[in-house]
């Protein structure tokens, strides 16, 4: 699988990340999310339990459309590969300092690679030129999942000056601002976690509203 087929079917990819329950996954699925993310980094507040991850995987793969994304950060290729098989992940998201080709060459699944603006803009331009499209860049904060909004103005100015660059945007997204986000230059996807939570727990109403608003464009 590459991202080409996904993007052929969707104008924008809508991702809900940090899912920890089957109920939240089902809500995101029914709302129309294209990507559902689970945190596979140990000892984080949103780290998925193995048994729940397997249940969510079964649910998602019955849908036939939504893809399951496993999020990792500076973990070994071996560990990522093992969990990729155990959870039947469709896509691997690397949120640390990894060299994404090293992981892709072993795991053979599409990669979402977290990049920092403006430090990693060269990575973005390189990735966007590859065919087939097996890696998508994702602009987010260093830690991710913090609710920190990025500098949309600077990113938009940079993207407008480039030739055919695209990226997933994360960081500080909510149902209230996602319609603006999907209209920014270069944005082909949006990614939310904390922005659809209430008191640190996924909020079904917020998930539904977020996905609906993201899909309105």
UniProtKB/Swiss-Prot annotation:
Reaction(s) catalysed by this chain's protein: N-(5-phospho-beta-D-ribosyl)anthranilate = 1-(2-carboxyphenylamino)-1-deoxy-D-ribulose 5-phosphate
One GO term of the biological process aspect: L-tryptophan biosynthetic process
Encoding gene, per UniProt annotation: TRP1
InterPro entries per UniProt: Aldolase_TIM (IPR013785), PRAI_dom (IPR001240), RibuloseP-bd_barrel (IPR011060), TrpF_fam (IPR044643)
Superkingdom as given in the UniProt entry: Eukaryota
Pfam families, per database record: PRAI (PF00697)
Pathway stated in the Swiss-Prot or TrEMBL entry: Amino-acid biosynthesis; L-tryptophan biosynthesis; L-tryptophan from chorismate: step 3/5
Similarity annotation: Belongs to the TrpF family.
Keyword annotations from UniProtKB, A to Z: Amino-acid biosynthesis, Aromatic amino acid biosynthesis, Isomerase, Tryptophan biosynthesis
EC number: 5.3.1.24
Any one GO MF annotation of this record: phosphoribosylanthranilate isomerase activity
Gene3D superfamilies: Aldolase class I
Record-given protein name: N-(5'-phosphoribosyl)anthranilate isomerase
Keyword Amino-acid biosynthesis assigned: yes
Stored HAMAP family: PRAI
Disulfide bonds: none
Organism (species): Candida glabrata (strain ATCC 2001 / BCRC 20586 / JCM 3761 / NBRC 0622 / NRRL Y-65 / CBS 138)
């Amino acid at each position: 699988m590459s991202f080409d087929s996904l993007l052929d079917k969707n104008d924008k990819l809508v991702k809900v990340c940090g899912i920890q329950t089957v109920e939240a996954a089902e809500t995101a699925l029914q709302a129309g999310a294209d990507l559902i993310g689970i945190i596979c980094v140990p000892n984080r507040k949103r780290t998925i339990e193995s048994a729940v991850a397997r249940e969510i995987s079964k649910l998602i793969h019955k849908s036939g459309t939504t893809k399951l994304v496993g999020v990792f950060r500076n973990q070994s290729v071996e560990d990522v590969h093992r969990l990729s098989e155990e959870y039947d992940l469709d896509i691997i998201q690397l949120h640390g300092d990894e060299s994404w080709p090293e992981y892709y060459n072993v795991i053979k699944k599409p990669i979402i690679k977290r990049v920092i603006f403006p430090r990693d803009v060269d990575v973005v331009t390189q990735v966007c030129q590859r065919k087939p499209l097996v890696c998508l860049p994702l602009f987010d904060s260093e830690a991710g999942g913090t609710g920190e909004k990025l500098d949309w103005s600077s990113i938009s100015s940079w993207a407008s000056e480039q030739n055919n660059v695209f990226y997933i945007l994360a960081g500080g997204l909510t149902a209230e601002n996602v319609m603006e986000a999907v209209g920014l230059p270069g944005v082909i996807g949006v990614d939310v976690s904390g922005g659809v939570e209430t008191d640190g727990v996924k909020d079904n109403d917020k998930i539904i509203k977020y996905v609906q608003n993201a899909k309105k464009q």
